[in-house]
Amino acid sequence: MAQVERPQVVEKPIAILEPEEITTLLRTAAEYEGGKCLPAVGMMLYAGIRPHEVARLQWAQVNLSERSICIHPQHSKTGGARLVTIHPPLVKLLQDRQQPPEHRICPPQWPQHWRRVRRRAGWQRRLHPWTPDVLRHTFASYHLSHFRSYAELQLEMGHRDSALLRTRYVSAVQGKKTERFWKR
């Protein structure tokens, strides 16, 4: 039997947002319809929560005093529960915007609102397309640059091992950009 050659995997650079793009996105989310999309955008950006996970979250799962967000197994991509840390920039975004526990984090018709926020922040289909999961990749890259721990990042992201993080999630970020990300 002839052996089949394995194709060589060529990884592409991981797209992440630059500090200026983050500032524009957060400002746009804060200004859009009274900031109703800002908590969800903040959780994707500063906690690495997947878009479909944040769409399922309720405020009851957010504990600002313990600085954690509980992702239930039925809401996660991998089917496992996890506690995600609420880092200081996210605390600032959430502390004055909390809603009753039974309310969802995302407003009704979330996909349409999220598309509008991105468009108003400058991401257009052809001229400046939005990269899927760019906020999750941005979080992973800045987290690793700041905390320097694949193990900690793996827990935050809900990954079984760090191999996927190393090859598909993390882009190298240098000090000044990392400092700007975490000092908002």
What do the predicted segments below correspond to?
Residues 7-11, 25-33, 51-52, 65-91, ...:
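Basic, Lys/Arg-rich DNA-contacting stretches centered on the C-terminal catalytic core
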Residues 75, 87-127, 139:
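Active-site/catalytic core of tyrosine-dependent DNA strand-transfer enzymes
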Residues 16, 75-76, 150, 157-182:
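Catalytic-site neighborhood detector that most strongly recognizes the C-terminal catalytic loop/helix
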Residues 24, 56, 92-93, 152, ...:
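Short, solvent-exposed alpha-helical surface patches in well-structured domains
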Residues 6, 27, 56, 64, ...:
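Phosphate-coordinating loops and pocket residues in cytosolic domains that bind phosphorylated ligands
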Residues 57, 97, 113, 117, ...:
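Residues in the recognition helix of alpha-helical DNA-binding motifs
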Residues 2-51, 55, 77, 136:
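Basic, Lys/Arg- and aromatic-enriched nucleic-acid-binding interface segment
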Residues 42, 46, 52-53, 134-160, ...:
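C-terminal catalytic core of tyrosine-transesterase DNA break-rejoin enzymes
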